[in-house]
Every structure is written in structure tokens, then in C-alpha cells.
Amino acid sequence: MAEYWSACENIQNVFVVPSRDLSMFVRLRALRRLAGQAELANIDVALSFDPIPMIDYFAFLHWLQADATIGLSVTQYSLFRISIPDPVLEVPRRHAGERIVRTLAALGIATGLDQLKGLVPRSSEVAMQRRGEQWARPRIFLNGFGASTTRTFSATQLAAVARELIAQDSTFQLTINANAEQRTSPELRQLCADQPSRVQLFRPDATICDLLDAIAGCIVVLTPDTGVAHGAVAARTPLVVVFDDVEYNPICWRPLDRHAVCLLPERPEPISCMPVDKILEGIRQFLVR
């Protein structure tokens, strides 16, 4: 790989896609948002890192090159699959981005950790600029579940968080993305019956495009899923992400953004065990007008 890289004399811009748990659409949408930034106006090579082999990065890069709406010039595309040992086994809470940067440096590839911070450089500053328009109709997005049972809030937690937020400010509107079990639970059914004008359930047939669009208009997002968390950073929306810090949701893949609060339980346990007060404490950091 190092020999191939040194032979590419015309390569000037490298875009690193930290793609763990991210859908193709989220990566594509983030690239669209980068189009106006001069230093990334031309991307020569996109590097992708992901331990999940089923994702077709060649298809993604072809799609990137073919989509004229992105506004980026991709003069060359290559896929480097670098074998990176699971950082959870090395140092449990060291961010995976650090390992990626060290691996690149060992290959003679210059990059920086700032390129790994949630896909969008300076997203924090942009998020602050957008807060005025978001507060005109303040909506909070509660994503109730992830890809495994340990990464799922209980219906009781969701309902309790929602009721506390509704009581805090009469202008707050809540959207809850619930799985089938949560959606039919007595707690959420009663919540929606009690607050029909202020709480809505996100439709179950929604796509990742719909999800990202909904997140982009919110003042804060709560999620136990790292894919949704990185999507929120790409959408430049403040977020609270809850980790169980076990095999399927290691904190080493957390978003790197100063408008992302990461919560951990006191011990490795399902997210459904996290106290509601701790969740609310994280959310309320972003509820200051």
C-alpha cells in the first residue's frame, strides 16, 4: 500500500470516512454539506475504514462520483482496506480514530484527527449558527432503540424522559422513534393519548433520509445508536448518545464533537438500566436558549 501511495504523485486531498455504523446515505449527505468548503472542494482519494465487509465501498465511491449534486470533484477513487485490530481489545475507551491516525502515519500518509471528528469539520460552530432557527419551533428527537437489545431504551424510560421535557417548557415538541415493542407499550400509548399535540411517533416506514431530515430540524437528539449519533453530527444537531460500553456499542466509536454528550452506565449493563435523571441531565445541557 505504501508503494502504491508514493506512486500517486498528484494526490493532494485525502478525505477520511470513519464509517463504522454509518449508512451510505449519511456519508453521502455529509459530503454534500462539505461541498462549500474550499479545502475539500476537490477530493482525490476517499479512505474508508470499517470492520463490516458487507458494505460495498466501491459502489459508494461510484455513486459519489456520479452524483453531480454533491458539487465535489473526485479525480481518483481507491479503496484501502487497512486491517486495524479492534480498539476495544487494545484500550477500551481510546477512540478508534486515534488508532486509525496512527495506522495511517505508519504508512507514511499524512492526515489529522480533525478529519475524523464526526465527518464535518467545524460542525460545532455551524450548529451554533443554526440554533436560532431551531428554537423558533423547538423540537426534540428521541431515538428509542439501536441494533441490539442492550442498546434499547425501555418504554418506561422514554415516556418518563418525554414527560419531564414536556413539563419543563410548554413550547417543546417531541418526536419519538420507537420500535414495535415500544410503540405498542402502555407507557407510550398513554403518553401520546395525554399529549396528542406535543408528542408524535416517528413513522415506522421512514427511511434513513427521513430520519436525517427530521434530526436536522431539532434542538437536540437523544439516541442509544452510534449510527444515528454520527448522523446527528453530520446534520449539525446537538446530541446526547448513551452507550452500554459492551461488545456491540463500544464508546471508542463515539462522535468527536463538542456538541455531543456521551453517557455511560456505572457498569457494563443494558441502556435500559440507566437512570432517567442522568439522561435528562445530559439533554438539559442543550436546552438553554
Per-segment meaning from a language model:
Residues 1-289:
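Catalytic machinery of carbohydrate-active enzymes
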